[in-house]
C-alpha cells in the first residue's frame, strides 16, 4: 500500500473526526445490554491496514517476563509479546487469545456473571458502554512503568468475523487463580462477535483475536473523554486510536501513519442535519451537514444508506450494498482479502473488477504477504514477499 495514499486517507479521517463529529455522549443513555454504543463509534478508520497488522502480530516473538498465561481453566496458553514495545511512537504490547466477557464494574450483575466485582481497576466502568480489555494482574505489576490504566487498545476480531478492528481502553485486570488472558467487556465482545450471543458465562472460544495495548502516558485516554463509569467522547478514542495504530503501521513498514496534521477535537454538540430528507443516525456523516454534505473518502464514511459522491456524503438510491463495513468500494486495501463481497484490491483501493479470479484460501490470495509458495492459494506464487499470479 503506498505510504502517501495511506497517510492522506488517514489524515482525512482524522480531520473528519476532529471537525465534523466532535460528539459528546451521555454514557448512561447507552448503559444497556442491548443498547450500547454502535460499532461505528469505536471502529478503526477504513484507511488502517488491519490485515497487515494482524499478520505482523502473529509473527511477534519477543517474550518479556511474566508474559504467558492460559486462556482458560486447563486450556492452551497465550503469550504477550513486546516486539513493538520499544518504538518511540505507537509502542505497544500484543497478544493473540480468545475473548471471554468481563462485566466487572457498573454492570457486574450482567447475564452469566453471578460473581462479578463492583469495581474495575481505575473506576467502575460500564461493560455495556465502554469497550475495554483486560490484562493479567501479574503482567500489569511487572510493567507498571509503561502499561497505564485507561490506555488506548486496539482489538482485531477473528477473520471469521471479518477481521474488523475496534478501539477500546485497558480498563481492568484479571486476578483470578490462575490468571488468564483473552478477556474484554460485554460491549467489545458482543460487537466483535454479534452472532454468538456472548455473555458473562459464554465467551468466544477460538484463540483468534488480536489484542494490542499501547504504552506510555501519551496513550492514556484523557479525563475529558472518560469518567469513572463511561466514555464521554468516542471521537477522542477513535482519533487517538487511528493516530497510535498509524504510527505502529509506519514503524512496521506497513504503509504510513506518520506526518499527520494535529487533530483539533471539540466537545460541543453537533447541529442537526439540514437540507436533506429523512433521519441520519451518525452525526457528522450526513448528507446535509452544514448544508454541504459531510466530507468522505468512501461510502463507509457516510451514515445509513448515503453514498460518498465527489468527496461528499449524498443520497444515492442506487448505492451498492456492502456487507463488510470499512472494506467497501473506495476503502484502502493491500490484497483482495481486505475488500468486501466481490470487490477486488486494485492499486490499493477496493474496486469493482468483473474479471477478478476467485480465491479459495482466505488470507492467502493475490497480494497477501508470504514467505514461500506454500503460503499462497492455488496457482499463485510467492514473489518478493507477496502472493502473485
From Swiss-Prot:
Its main location: secreted. Residues 1-22 form the signal peptide. One of its GO terms (molecular function) is chitosanase activity. GO terms for cellular component: extracellular region. Its EC number is 3.2.1.132. Keywords: Carbohydrate metabolism, Glycosidase, Hydrolase, Polysaccharide degradation, Repeat, Secreted, Signal. InterPro entries: Chitosanase_fungal. It catalyses: Endohydrolysis of beta-(1->4)-linkages between D-glucosamine residues in a partly acetylated chitosan. The C-terminal R3 domain contains 3 tandem repeats required for the binding to insoluble chitosan. This is Endo-chitosanase C. It comes from Aspergillus oryzae (strain ATCC 42149 / RIB 40) (Yellow koji mold). The gene is csnC.
Amino acid at each position: 500500500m503506498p505510504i502517501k495514499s495511506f497517510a492522506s486517507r488517514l489524515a482525512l479521517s482524522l480531520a473528519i473526526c476532529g471537525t465534523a463529529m466532535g460528539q459528546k455522549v451521555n454514557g448512561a443513555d447507552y448503559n444497556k445490554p442491548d443498547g450500547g454504543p454502535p460499532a461505528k463509534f469505536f471502529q478503526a478508520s477504513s484507511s488502517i491496514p488491519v490485515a497487515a497488522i494482524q499478520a505482523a502480530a502473529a509473527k511477534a516473538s519477543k517474550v518479556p517476563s511474566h508474559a504467558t498465561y492460559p486462556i482458560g481453566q486447563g486450556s492452551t496458553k497465550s503469550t504477550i509479546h513486546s516486539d513493538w514495545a520499544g518504538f518511540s511512537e505507537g509502542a505497544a504490547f500484543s497478544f493473540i487469545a480468545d475473548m471471554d466477557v468481563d462485566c466487572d464494574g457498573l454492570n457486574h450483575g450482567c447475564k452469566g456473571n453471578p460473581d462479578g466485582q463492583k469495581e474495575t481497576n481505575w473506576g467502575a466502568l460500564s461493560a455495556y458502554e465502554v469497550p475495554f480489555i483486560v490484562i493479567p494482574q501479574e503482567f500489569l505489576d511487572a510493567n507498571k512503568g509503561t502499561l497505564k490504566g485507561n490506555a488506548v487498545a486496539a482489538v482485531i476480531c477473528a477473520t471469521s468475523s471479518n477481521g474488523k478492528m475496534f478501539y477500546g481502553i485497558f480498563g481492568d485486570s484479571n486476578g483470578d487463580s490462575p490468571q488468564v488472558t483473552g478477556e474484554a467487556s460485554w460491549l467489545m465482545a458482543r460487537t466483535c462477535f454479534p452472532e454468538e450471543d456472548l455473555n458473562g458465562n459464554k465467551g468466544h472460544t477460538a484463540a483468534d483475536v488480536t489484542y494490542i495495548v499501547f504504552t506510555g502516558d501519551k496513550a492514556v485516554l484523557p479525563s475529558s473523554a472518560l469518567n469513572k463509569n463511561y466514555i464521554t467522547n468516542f471521537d477522542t478514542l477513535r482519533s487517538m486510536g487511528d493516530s497510535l495504530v498509524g504510527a505502529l503501521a509506519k514503524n512496521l513498514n506497513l504503509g504510513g501513519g506518520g506526518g499527520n496534521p494535529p487533530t483539533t477535537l471539540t466537545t460541543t454538540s453537533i447541529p442537526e442535519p439540514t437540507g436533506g430528507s429523512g433521519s441520519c443516525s451518525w452525526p457528522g456523516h450526513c448528507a446535509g451537514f452544514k448544508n454541504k454534505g459531510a466530507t468522505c473518502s468512501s461510502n463507509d464514511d457516510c451514515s445509513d444508506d448515503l453514498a460518498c459522491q465527489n468527496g461528499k456524503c449524498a443520497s444515492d438510491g442506487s448505492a451498492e450494498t456492502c456487507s463488510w463495513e470499512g472494506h467497501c468500494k473506495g476503502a484502502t486495501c493491500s490484497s483482495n482479502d481486505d475488500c468486501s463481497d466481490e470487490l477486488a484490491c486494485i492499486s490499493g483501493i477496493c474496486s469493482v473488477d468483473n474479471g477478478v479470479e476467485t480465491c479459495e484460501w482466505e488470507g492467502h490470495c493475490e497480494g497477501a504477504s508470504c514467505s514461500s509458495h506454500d503460503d499462497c492459494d492455488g496457482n499463485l506464487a510467492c514473489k518478493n514477499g507477496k502472493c502473485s499470479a
